Swiss-Prot record:
GO terms for cellular component: cytoplasmic side of endoplasmic reticulum membrane; UDP-N-acetylglucosamine transferase complex. Belongs to the glycosyltransferase 28 family. GO terms for biological process: dolichol-linked oligosaccharide biosynthetic process. It catalyses: an N-acetyl-alpha-D-glucosaminyl-diphospho-di-trans,poly-cis-dolichol + UDP-N-acetyl-alpha-D-glucosamine = an N,N'-diacetylchitobiosyl-diphospho-di-trans,poly-cis-dolichol + UDP + H(+). Keywords: Endoplasmic reticulum, Glycosyltransferase, Transferase. Heterodimer with alg14 to form a functional enzyme. It comes from Schizosaccharomyces pombe (strain 972 / ATCC 24843). The gene is alg13. GO terms for molecular function: N-acetylglucosaminyldiphosphodolichol N-acetylglucosaminyltransferase activity. This is UDP-N-acetylglucosamine transferase subunit alg13. Pfam families: Glyco_tran_28_C. Its EC number is 2.4.1.141. Involved in protein N-glycosylation. Essential for the second step of the dolichol-linked oligosaccharide pathway. Disulfide bonds: none annotated.
Amino acid sequence: MNAFVTVGSTQFDDLIRAVLKPEFQHCLVKHGINQLIVQYGKGKQAFGDPKSVAGLTILGFDYAPEIESYIHDASIVISHAGAGSILQTLRSGKRLLVVPNESLMDNHQVELATKLASMNYLVTCSTSNLVEGLEELYPKILTPFPKSDCSTFQKVMQDVAR
């Protein structure tokens, strides 16, 4: 089983560093994850030459023409709170842990993640409590996101924009 991490097109070094910490890697292995795939965007330096704990392989890349196949193949997705990444993952039916990039200016990522978490579609956390976020995600029964109806997501976006 694998976990897929995406930071989108922005730089989110804090998330990259957080998923590479041994305590987070041990938590992944504990939950049966044996491969961590990291789309690090502009964070190549933060990704560096990662050291993995026993039982876990780490792969990384900057960008791909599409990430749908990575999401499809993942057991869980750990994502920045970009609307596109969230919607794509929710539509795939994958378990989603969202980590807003709180360093962005005029950032609605926190509001979007919080609203969708309150609707039980995903779990959200910060980079400082990523292990706790993962531990919350695993036993939680999430509400399936409506497959063909975008009105729920549009409503959330309208609420966040207000």
